[in-house]
A protein has these predicted regions:
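A transmembrane-helix-recognition feature enriched in membrane-embedded lipid enzymes
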Residues: 174-193
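A structural signal for short, hydrophobic/glycine-enriched beta-strand patches
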Residues: 23-176
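Short, Lys/Arg-enriched, disordered terminal segments
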Residues: 1-8, 79, 201-204
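Enrichment for repetitive, rod-forming helical segments
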Residues: 12, 74, 188-192
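Short linear elements at protein peripheries
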Residues: 192-204
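N-terminal type II signal-anchor transmembrane helix
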Residues: 1-38
Length: 204
């Protein structure tokens, strides 16, 4: 009985921590995410957070598609000058950054204005590498709102002056975002850094 009570109390404590963290991230990002292109301030670089081009059923992943559309729209509106795509390229047959680049070029974005980060395995890696490798202390994050909020929360920890543009969403906040935010909080608490850093790359 005592063990059951401990398990119940522990579960309640964990659930409460997850709940508080989720809403704390929302609070920290308040006023820093934008839905309208005409309202968002200009930045030199827009950071597109990676996603798989295809969903598990083989169809185009709408999270991916809407991020491509958002990045192209910001560029064409003069809100960003360069696009940095950060994503996963951990396998030979899987290359998020190149997929984004090809589709951005198809939308009329000049190839010389697109830069790729092949080791953006997770949001923390993408944000920190944008600063440490690509030399960007201020930039516009491009993803869906729930993802942008977490990215800005991470950015603030690393003294990055980030704002975000909310690409069209597919559905309300995915349940796994509650866990993703908790993991992000723990990563920051225990000072977990990117998997890889490396040589500096200038965006110009």
């Amino acid at each position: 009985m005592k063990t059951l009570k401990i398990l119940i109390l522990t579960s309640i404590f964990i659930a409460y921590g997850v709940f508080i963290t989720f809403h704390w991230v929302n609070f920290k990002a308040k006023g820093l995410t934008y839905d309208a292109i005409d309202k968002i301030p200009k930045n030199n670089v827009g950071l597109v957070l990676g996603a798989s081009k295809h969903a598990s059923n083989g169809n185009i992943n709408l999270f991916y598609k809407h991020r491509v559309d958002a990045a192209a729209a910001l560029y064409k509106a003069g809100k960003i000058k360069y696009i940095l795509v950060s994503g996963d390229n951990s396998r030979k047959d899987y290359d998020e950054p190149t997929d984004f680049k090809n589709d951005l070029i198809a939308k009329g974005i000049p190839t010389e204005h697109i830069f790729l980060d092949y080791t953006g395995f997770r949001t923390l890696d993408s944000m920190v590498r944008a600063k440490e490798i690509f030399g960007q202390n201020a930039f516009t994050v491009i993803s869906q709102r729930f993802h942008n909020q977490r990215a800005i929360y991470i950015a603030q920890h690393y003294d990055i002056d980030a704002i975000a543009f909310n690409a069209k969403d597919v559905y309300k906040t995915p349940p796994r975002e509650y866990l993703a935010r908790t993991k992000a909080r723990l990563d920051l608490l225990f000072n977990v850094g990117p998997k890889f850093l490396g040589d500096k790359i200038a965006i110009k």
